[in-house]
Structures are given as structure tokens and as C-alpha cells.
């Protein structure tokens, strides 16, 4: 069911680009940007956020965990909690589609939260079937109507929870920007909500006359926001005279392990890839107390906290006889939550490879397979809420995502010297051992809200 007031203008179709960019090395404080009203403390009545169109599912979809009494964390808004769970549902579904398109020996890394944020900014201007498909694919239709109607407000609250953290040892920062063609007038409501909720200011560029210079300007902005780690995210010739708008979301994370690995204990060991081949990886080692559990069919789950404890890395390692691909297919938000709930602190021997993953891909094919079809179609797309006067000739020509992850003994790629004393390798046969010498899944999550910020697969840590 839709509620909208729009005008339709027919002309040559113009392109909208979405870029969901992410850098993670391993995490200051980002405030909600540029408004006299503090979105982080505001209530819904304080800031009206009414997009052009609202979609309500005729029948609210039941979710697998509906009816279960999963406890909402203290000082957490119920609507923010719902949104976080919706993002987790999208994360696991999208990952499975992406994994199906990859070779088992390929590394994968992405930020589902970054992707959801970029498309939430697009949802602001969407109507009709385009809006419905956005709601369904990103699982926004699984949350209550009250949350759905004000989803951008609660996205702001979620961002405040995630990014407004004072922690000198860790850093989690998000930056958004709209790059629009300077010849066009953009919808004022779209601009206001984008800036207030997502901190996405509009920067005019000359796509018509200077497409290549515009591409270079956007890539430079991304490079600056990711400390030079992500460059040339927009490929050559991706921007032309028909481009109207480029939406960019970046997330940067850098953190130090709560319990660091000693470089003196790192040594070369074999890592066994999915195809049966092996490679020589730098295997880190430490003994300590960590949250751990051996779950269904011998799969091991380990949680490694970063300093501050709010953000952790979760590793999922199948037993040697079970392929990671099978675990990937079976994984749901409910299964993952069940495993996390079962974790218990115990003494553990941890062997983990040092690795670096860079991953970049178009989101278009996977999202189309998931049902987001109209948004990418020049004939069907309905995005009247972006350009002034209800102009309805826009579509998304492509959406790009790029990610970077580096893990080492300190946690981050910029390792500092440390005076922490860590025991060397021992031969205690009674200790439980977690040895990641074969493909494993990796999640980086914000613990209180259980928000999946990053996720991926380490299939080959030997790639340079």
C-alpha cells in the first residue's frame, strides 16, 4: 500500500549512482552533522521527516524469531533494536547471494550496514513498486509500521549509537556525501533529511561537461575519508553526461585487540584452501580467556574483543570434514544469534592467520536476484522524490561497493609498540584449541545492539 503525492515528467532517463564504500583496518567520535537540532537526543515529534512516499505491507511479514523473548539491551530504543535486526537479516541474505557468485577460493569482505545505509538514502526518494522492493529486499518490511514510517529517524538513532563512542583505543567513523549535477535543483526535503540523518551534504559537480573530472573529485573524497586505503572506487567511464546523482557511504574502522598477539609467536604455517591446495601463511598465536563454543556438527565459534569491548570479531570455523560453503548456506540471523548466546569464557589456544583482504564489486546483480529490479530499470524506476518538481525519469544504473580489511598482531595495520607481556607457545594438551588454518567466516559486530558492521570469508590469507 502506498501513500504519495507526485507529479510525473517524461524525458530521457537520467542515472543515479550508489557507492557503498568501506575501509576497515582495525576503530573517535562522529556527531550528527550540521543541524541546530541534535538528532541524537531528539524525539520523532521534534523533527518531521516525511518522505514523498510511504509503503506499508498489506500484511506485516512474520519473522522467524517473532514471538521469542529476545531481551532488548538496556537504554536501547525498541525501534532502533528492530532496525538493527532488519539489517542483520539483510546481511546474511545478501552474503549468501554474493557467496553463490564467487569461487570457494575467493576471499569476501563487505559492510552490509554500509550497503543498507546507501540504499536507505535512495529509499528517501522512491515511490510505488520501487519503494516496495527496497522495503522488502532490505527487510525494512519486517519491522513495525511505527518504525517503518520513521525509518530514517531511527537510522539516525542507530548511527548515533554506533558512531558516537568516546574510546581512544578504537575508532568507528561513517561519512556520507551526495554528489549532484550542478544544472539540477534537488528536492529540498530529500536534501534536508539526507543531511540531518545521514550527514550527507550535497556537493554540486558538472557531470554533463566534465564527467571525468567529476569522477576524479568523488574518488579523491573517498580516498581522503578512508585515509588513502580505497582509491578509484568509481571505474573509468562509469560517469557520463546522463549522471544525475552519486550517493556515497564510507565506513572506517580501526581498533586494537583487547588481548594482543605477540609478534614473536607468529610463524609460517600451512593454510589449507577449499580446493585442497595449501599456502604458507603467517600464523599468529596466543593463549588466553575468550568467549568460545563448539556448536552444531563441530563448528567452532570464537569471539575476540577489541579494546572497549563494544566491538568484537567473531570467527566461525567448520571442522575439517565440513566445507565452509555448507555453513554459509545454513547461516541465518537466528542461527548466528543462537551461537553467540551459547558462547562461554574459557581458556583457549588461538592460532589465527595474519591477513589482508581487498574486495570490490558491483551490487547490482545480487540485489536484482533478491528482488530489487525496478530501481535499476530505466523503464520502471520511480524516484520522484530526489529532483525538484517530482521529476520521475531517474534510475540507478549501478551500485559499487569496496572494502578493505587487515588483521595483524596489534589489531590494526598501523601497529604501535607495546609493553604487554604475553606468554609464548606452550604444549598444554588439555587446552581447547582454535586453529584457523582453513577457510573461516569473520564478522565484526557492535555488541550491545548486535549490529553486523562487517562480514566476510577468509579463504586465502596468503594473497598479497
UniProtKB/Swiss-Prot annotation:
CDD domains attached to this UniProt entry: serpinC1_AT3
Effect of substituting residue 425 to P: In AT3D; type-II; Pescara; deprived of inhibitory of activity
Entry-annotated residues carrying Phosphoserine: 68
Protein's gene: SERPINC1
The protein's assembly and partners: Forms protease inhibiting heterodimer with TMPRSS7.
InterPro entries listed in its UniProt record: Antithrombin_3_serpin_domain, Serpin_CS, Serpin_dom, Serpin_fam, Serpin_sf, Serpin_sf_1, Serpin_sf_2
Impact noted for substituting residue 127 to R: In AT3D; type-I
Protein name as catalogued: Antithrombin-III
Outcome of mutating residue 190 to C: In AT3D; uncertain significance
Amino acid at each position: 500500500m502506498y501513500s504519495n503525492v507526485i507529479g510525473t515528467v517524461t524525458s530521457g532517463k537520467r542515472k543515479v549512482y550508489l557507492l557503498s564504500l568501506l575501509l576497515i583496518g582495525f576503530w573517535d567520535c562522529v556527531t550528527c552533522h550540521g543541524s541546530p537540532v541534535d538528532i541524537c537526543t531528539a524525539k520523532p515529534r521534534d523533527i518531521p521527516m516525511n518522505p514523498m512516499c510511504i509503503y506499508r505491507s498489506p500484511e506485516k511479514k512474520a519473522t522467524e524469531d517473532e514471538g521469542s523473548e529476545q531481551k532488548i539491551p538496556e537504554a536501547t530504543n525498541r525501534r532502533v533494536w528492530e532496525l538493527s535486526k532488519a539489517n542483520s537479516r539483510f546481511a546474511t541474505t545478501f552474503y549468501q547471494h554474493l557467496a553463490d557468485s564467487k569461487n570457494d577460493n575467493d576471499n569476501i569482505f563487505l559492510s552490509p550496514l554500509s550497503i543498507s545505509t546507501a540504499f536507505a538514502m535512495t529509499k528517501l526518494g522512491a515511490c510505488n513498486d520501487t519503494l516496495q522492493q527496497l522495503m522488502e529486499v532490505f527487510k525494512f518490511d519486517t519491522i513495525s509500521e511505527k518504525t517503518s514510517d520513521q525509518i530514517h529517524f531511527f537510522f539516525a538513532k542507530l548511527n548515533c549509537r554506533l558512531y558516537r563512542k568516546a574510546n581512544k583505543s578504537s575508532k568507528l567513523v561513517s561519512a556520507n556525501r551526495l554528489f549532484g549535477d550542478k544544472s539540477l535543483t534537488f528536492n529540498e526535503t530529500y536534501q534536508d533529511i539526507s543531511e540531518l540523518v545521514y550527514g550527507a551534504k550535497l556537493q554540486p559537480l558538472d557531470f554533463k561537461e566534465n564527467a571525468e573530472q567529476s569522477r576524479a573529485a568523488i574518488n579523491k573524497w573517498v580516498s581522503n575519508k578512508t585515509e588513502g586505503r580505497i582509491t578509484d572506487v568509481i571505474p573509468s567511464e562509469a560517469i557520463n553526461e546522463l549522471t544525475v546523482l552519486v550517493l556515497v557511504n564510507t565506513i572506517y574502522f580501526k581498533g586494537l585487540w583487547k588481548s594482543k598477539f605477540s609478534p614473536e609467536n607468529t610463524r609460517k604455517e600451512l593454510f589449507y584452501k577449499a580446493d585442497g591446495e595449501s599456502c604458507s601463511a603467517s600464523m599468529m598465536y596466543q593463549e588466553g580467556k575468550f568467549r568460545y563454543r563448539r556448536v552444531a556438527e563441530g563448528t567452532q565459534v570464537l569471539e575476540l574483543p577489541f579494546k572497549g569491548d563494544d566491538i568484537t570479531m567473531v570467527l566461525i570455523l567448520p571442522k575439517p570434514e565440513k566445507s565452509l560453503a555448507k555453513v554459509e548456506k545454513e547461516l541465518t540471523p537466528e542461527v548466528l544469534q543462537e551461537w553467540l548466546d551459547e558462547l562461554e569464557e574459557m581458556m583457549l589456544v588461538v592460532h589465527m592467520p595474519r591477513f589482508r583482504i581487498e574486495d570490490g564489486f558491483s551490487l547490482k546483480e545480487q540485489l536484482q536476484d533478491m528482488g530489487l529490479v525496478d530501481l535499476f530499470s530505466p523503464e520502471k524506476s520511480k524516484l520522484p522524490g530526489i529532483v525538484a518538481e517530482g521529476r520521475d525519469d531517474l534510475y540507478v544504473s549501478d551500485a559499487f561497493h569496496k572494502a578493505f580489511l587487515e588483521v595483524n598482531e596489534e589489531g590494526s595495520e598501523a601497529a604501535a609498540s607495546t609493553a604487554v607481556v604475553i606468554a609464548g607457545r606452550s604444549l598444554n594438551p588439555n587446552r581447547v584449541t582454535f586453529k584457523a588454518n582453513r577457510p573461516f567466516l569473520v564478522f565484526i559486530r557492535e555488541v550491545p545492539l548486535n549490529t553486523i558492521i562487517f562480514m566476510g570469508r577468509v579463504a586465502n590469507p596468503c594473497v598479497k
